[in-house]
């Protein structure tokens, strides 16, 4: 399955929630109407969605939120299922500790997609070593830094400036002057997207 390259706001409308696929420079309210499904007039409400339909929709929502394709998403779920603890929460934590997401959370990218692109272009180091793998798992104590040659990139500077205004998660510490951040700890469930029902995803893969 190829990566979706169409209008990002359309995906948020389809899921009925902000998937944070667009920059926070504009509020989502000005970008699309979440209560209106894609289509010229929006899809009319029909019969009640089945349990399977709800489970599938939740999986699609999380995949789109993190920009993950099906095969890779299944691998993340399998890894989460192998670990001790709540499988759904572990799945979200694995996704949150991806390097492209951490770059986004630290404010170096305005969206996860931009963070992924910057990582692939070798704009960052992790503990002093250049890493260009978006799925690289960041660990507590790791230092993610913008490379010297990338520090003047307008999109990074603007994204960081905006992030400073909005605020960053408590589980990262960012030095804006040095343009580097420390991954302090794996976020608790309460610090991850609230508008996700991960138990539905667990139910789907447990069928």
Curated annotation (Swiss-Prot):
Residues 42-53 have a biased composition (Polar residues). Residues 97-157 form the S4 RNA-binding domain. Keywords: Ribonucleoprotein, Ribosomal protein, RNA-binding, rRNA-binding. GO terms for molecular function: rRNA binding; structural constituent of ribosome. GO terms for biological process: ribosomal small subunit biogenesis; translation. Gene3D superfamilies: Ribosomal Protein S4 Delta 41, Chain A, domain 1 (1.10.1050.10), RNA-binding S4 domain (3.10.290.10). One of its GO terms (cellular component) is small ribosomal subunit. CDD domains: S4 (cd00165). InterPro entries: Ribosomal_uS4, Ribosomal_uS4_bac-type, Ribosomal_uS4_N, S4_RNA-bd, S4_RNA-bd_sf. Residues 31-56 are annotated as: Disordered. It holds the Pfam family Ribosomal_S4. Part of the 30S ribosomal subunit. Contacts protein S5. The interaction surface between S4 and S5 is involved in control of translational fidelity. One of the primary rRNA binding proteins, it binds directly to 16S rRNA where it nucleates assembly of the body of the 30S subunit. Belongs to the universal ribosomal protein uS4 family. This is Small ribosomal subunit protein uS4.
């Amino acid at each position: 399955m190829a990566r979706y390259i169409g209008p990002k706001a359309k995906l948020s409308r389809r899921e009925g929630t902000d998937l944070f696929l667009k920059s926070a420079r504009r509020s989502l309210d000005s970008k699309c109407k979440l209560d209106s499904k894609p289509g010229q007039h929006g899809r009319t409400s029909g019969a009640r969605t089945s349990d399977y339909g709800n489970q599938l929709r939740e999986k699609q929502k999380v995949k789109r939120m993190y920009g993950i394709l099906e095969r890779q998403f299944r691998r993340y779920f399998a890894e989460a299922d192998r670990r001790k603890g709540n499988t759904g929460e572990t799945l979200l934590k694995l996704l949150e500790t991806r390097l492209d997401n951490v770059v986004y959370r630290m404010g170096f990218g305005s969206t996860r997609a931009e963070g992924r692109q910057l990582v692939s272009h070798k704009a960052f180091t992790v503990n002093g070593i250049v890493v260009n793998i978006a799925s690289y798992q960041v660990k507590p104590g790791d230092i993610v830094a913008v490379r010297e040659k990338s520090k003047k990139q307008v999109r990074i500077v603007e994204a960081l400036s905006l992030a400073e205004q909005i605020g960053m998660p408590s589980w990262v510490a960012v030095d804006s002057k040095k343009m580097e951040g420390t991954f302090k700890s794996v976020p608790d469930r309460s610090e991850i997207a609230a508008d996700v029902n991960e138990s539905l995803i667990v139910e789907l893969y447990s069928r």
